[in-house]
A protein has these predicted regions:
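Surface-exposed, charge/polar-rich loops and edge strands
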Residues: 2-354
Length: 354
């Protein structure tokens, strides 16, 4: 494979094309359909998706639920305002957090939130500046307190506050643990999912808890030097069997979102098949890497030079992906987390080597 540089994945995007709020209704977002067989592009609405699905196809969605993990509190006893962003559970009520202002939150610092029924003590400062923090509360679970006091950790390019926190959750989200939404799934409504199932298309779930590393820019010039962040995933027996049966019958496995895609490809690369398992993955999919599971991908339009546009290029082909993004800008598609979607139809990743 020819070496590729980060700048190869740059494209110019007018700021006004960065979506600040989701489409309403969700399935009114636009859908760019990219056809592997003839390289044609079609411009549709997301609710038209069932027209491009066939009986026996399998959609794989990520059921991870976003934590309202950004909480603002005051340091005790000074009353200075500070902020914690919960990144991952370490053990019990101890979490790794991003703290602001980090330098003023040394081990032993106590913080109270809201009416004081949620407090936290900083245990340790890590090499990267993150903190280990233990939480104390008067409810059965910490999640109840986060629902009460927390805010959704929106990406930095979204500057508008949400009218409703559920706008940043998929309709099928149930496994709490993500620091960001698996955004391709935001376009689905219960009615659209019913329509898809009525066509004979199966829908199954995996879990991958999206970390804030998904927003971390690639620093290295040579993309192969980039080290991916690690994220926890889980695949059930039911999902593994459905994927096996779908493949055996000659039908397509279509990942809804890059997180579902990375989960399936990580498991397939590790075991040579999809099996029930859980663990952590730092899989990096870029042009030249072979796909071993998925036959199609539903995804949003991603940031320039991000690992996600590299993933799309790996599946659809670098030149074709960058051309499609150029068309997206020309046609005034809405970009990033609350933006429009694309559906890469057909192909099992072999085209991505071009």
């Amino acid at each position: 494979m020819l070496s590729m540089l980060k700048r190869d994945f740059w494209y110019d995007l007018p700021k006004e094309l960065i979506a600040q709020e989701p489409a309403c209704p969700r399935d009114a977002a636009r859908l760019m359909v990219l056809n592997q067989k003839d390289d044609s592009i079609q411009h549709r609405i997301f609710r038209d998706l069932p027209e491009y699905l066939e009986p026996g196809d399998l959609l794989v969605v990520n059921n991870s639920k976003v934590l309202p993990a950004r909480i603002v509190g005051v340091k005790q006893p000074t009353g200075a305002v500070c902020e914690l962003l919960l990144l991952r559970q370490v053990k019990g009520d101890q979490w790794e957090c991003l703290a602001k202002p980090g330098k003023r939150m040394q081990p032993g610092t106590k913080v109270s939130f809201g009416d004081g029924s949620l407090t936290a003590i900083v245990d340790e400062t890590l090499e990267d500046g993150n903190k280990f923090v233990t939480f104390y509360y008067d409810t059965e679970t910490l999640y109840e307190k986060l629902d009460e006091f927390g805010k959704m950790p929106l990406p930095p390019y979204i500057t508008k506050q949400l009218d409703d926190q559920s706008q940043y959750q998929t309709v099928y989200a149930k496994e709490l643990g993500s620091a960001a939404a698996p955004t391709a799934g935001l376009h689905f409504t219960p009615e659209l999912m019913d329509t898809i199932r009525a066509k004979g298309v199966n829908i199954t779930e995996v879990t991958l808890h999206v970390g804030l590393g998904t927003f971390r820019p690639v620093q290295e010039d040579e993309i192969t030097d980039h080290k991916m962040h690690s994220e926890w995933y889980s695949v059930s027996e039911e999902t593994a069997k459905l994927i096996h049966d779908t493949k055996a019958a000659g039908h397509r496995v279509i990942a809804v979102g890059t997180t579902s895609c990375r989960t399936l490809e990580a498991v397939a690369a590790k075991y040579g098949e999809i099996r029930a398992c859980s663990g952590n993955t730092d899989i990096f999919l870029y042009p030249g890497v072979k796909f071993n599971c998925i036959d199609g991908l539903i995804t949003n339009f991603h940031l320039p030079e991000s690992t996600l546009i590299m993933l799309v290029s790996a599946l659809y082909g670098y030149e074709k992906t960058m051309a499609a993004y150029k068309v997206g800008v020309q046609e005034r598609y809405r970009f990033f987390s609350f933006g429009d979607a694309m559906f890469i139809r057909g192909g099992n990743g072999t085209e991505g080597k071009k």
